[in-house]
């Protein structure tokens, strides 16, 4: 229909990615062997409460994540800005809210529609730095029991972990239609988004051609305008800006233009920005375990 765009079929990994250390490629697996050790691949922590076996990889650049994915084939990639945007709007339509962190409610409302949200996610692990220096700690596949259903699964620290953390603690790990931790736990690099600092704001560029994704600007990256100049809670996004052409707005890109919202109004999410002159920035999405 008029104004619509076709979104081609793609696959999204069920879990946050780790690295196959033997072949140096990304892998979305439930596996606690050294071959798939997550975090920064620190073997010294094996057998301790801080073990990185079975958790996603971290401490890698966007370029490194992309390169490790592309070793699997030209059509493979790391987490994707355009995919994330699609997932967000599918959620927003299904749950009729922009706040994905509303309390989870498995029941439909009286009219047969979804209600609530996906819960707070893994976002209140307040002693994270002291616990394990902010490395991942939620095992890949923790929500596997849900299959492709949306829900949350409790993750409770064992006795040794609780001593290290300083108290007993439980996090509730969300899965949206089979995609584990769509937000929270660890910040996620998202490919296809680049921005150039101007000292005042970021000039934002988006690529729709996954085979052209890069860490430097190329001809596939489209100038989308600029983001909000300061940190703050998102009130409006570029996709709702009437001055932007409909051909660009139709993708629904979640680029903040007004950061005067709050934690309970509008988009309810926080936007961090930096804009040093000439610096090229990527996008980290989803928040982290202590935020």
What label would you give each PLM region?
Residues 1-182:
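Short aromatic-cysteine micro-motif
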Residues 83-85, 107-140, 144-149, 157-159, ...:
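C-terminal, surface-exposed recognition/capping segments
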Residues 196-208:
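A short, polar/charged loop-to-alpha-helix boundary motif
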């Amino acid at each position: 229909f008029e104004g619509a765009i076709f979104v081609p079929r793609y696959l999204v990994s069920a879990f946050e990615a780790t690295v196959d250390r033997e072949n140096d490629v990304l892998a979305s697996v439930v596996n606690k062997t050294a071959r798939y050790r997550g975090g920064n691949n620190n073997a010294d922590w094996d057998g301790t409460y801080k073990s990185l076996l079975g958790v996603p990889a971290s401490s890698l650049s966007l370029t490194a994540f992309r390169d490790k994915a592309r070793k699997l084939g030209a059509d493979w990639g790391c987490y994707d800005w355009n995919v994330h945007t699609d997932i967000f709007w599918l959620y927003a339509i299904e749950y009729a809210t922009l706040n994905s962190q509303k309390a989870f409610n498995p029941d439909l409302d009286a009219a047969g529609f979804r209600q609530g949200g996906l819960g707070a996610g893994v976002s209140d692990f307040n002693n994270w730095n002291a616990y394990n220096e902010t490395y991942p700690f939620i095992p890949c596949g923790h929500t596997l029991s849900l299959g492709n259903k949306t829900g949350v699964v409790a993750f409770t620290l064992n006795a040794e972990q609780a001593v290290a953390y300083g108290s007993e603690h439980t996090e509730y790990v969300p899965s949206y239609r089979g995609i584990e931790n769509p937000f929270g736990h660890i910040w996620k690099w998202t490919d296809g988004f680049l921005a150039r600092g101007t000292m005042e704001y970021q000039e934002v560029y988006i690529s729709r051609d996954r085979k052209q994704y890069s860490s430097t600007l190329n001809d596939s990256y489209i100038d989308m305008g600029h983001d909000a100049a300061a940190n703050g809670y998102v009130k409006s996004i570029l996709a709702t800006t009437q001055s932007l052409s409909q051909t660009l707005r139709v993708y629904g890109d979640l680029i903040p233009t007004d950061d005067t919202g709050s934690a309970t109004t509008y988009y309810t999410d926080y936007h961090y920005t930096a804009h040093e002159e000439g610096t090229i920035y990527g996008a980290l999405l989803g928040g982290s375990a202590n935020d």
